[in-house]
């Protein structure tokens, strides 16, 4: 748990990719998010910029699990970007090993990652400026993130 908390604290942003088990996020993921959200003061998820992707062999693409993860992360104080990606029929769309199976999916994942990166940069700048105004060096934590309303959804070919 300490290593998890240190890794999240040292990151600029977090990408959560979740499958869907029985209409919700997996218990292991929920447990990890719970550990990262405590204690409330000093929680490593607080003000961390996060993107969530859902992938499932079902036609829904883990839409419910993705919504649950977004709700839990928001409740923990994370800054969850609005850009979403659900991957229905993931078993047919993922390639062997660490490769994405189709170009359309690869581009959709890249779009989410670019949105995440764009959300982190202004937040880090705002934190640095606020820190300068207070007369102390920046801790690098995020204080704000822009809102992205575009929904990115890909269906199988």
Regions found by a protein language model. Give the residues of each.
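Short intrinsically disordered, low-complexity coil segments enriched in acidic
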Residues: 1-7, 109, 155
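Helix-loop-strand module that forms the ligand-binding subsite of alpha/beta enzymes
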Residues: 2-76
């Amino acid at each position: 748990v300490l290593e998890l908390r240190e890794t999240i604290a040292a990151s600029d942003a977090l990408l959560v990719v979740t499958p869907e088990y029985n209409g919700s996020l997996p218990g292991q993921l929920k447990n990890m998010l719970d550990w990262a959200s405590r204690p409330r003061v000093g929680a490593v998820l607080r003000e961390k910029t996060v993107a969530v992707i859902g992938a499932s062999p079902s036609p829904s693409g883990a839409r419910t699990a993705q919504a649950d993860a977004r709700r839990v992360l928001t409740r923990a104080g994370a800054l969850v970007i609005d850009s979403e990606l659900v991957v229905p029929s993931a078993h047919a769309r993922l390639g062997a090993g660490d490769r994405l199976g189709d170009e359309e999916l690869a581009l959709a994942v890249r779009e989410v990652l670019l949105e995440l990166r764009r959300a982190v940069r202004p937040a880090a700048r705002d934190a640095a400026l606020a820190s300068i105004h207070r007369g102390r060096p920046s801790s690098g934590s995020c204080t704000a993130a822009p809102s992205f309303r575009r929904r990115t959804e890909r269906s199988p070919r």
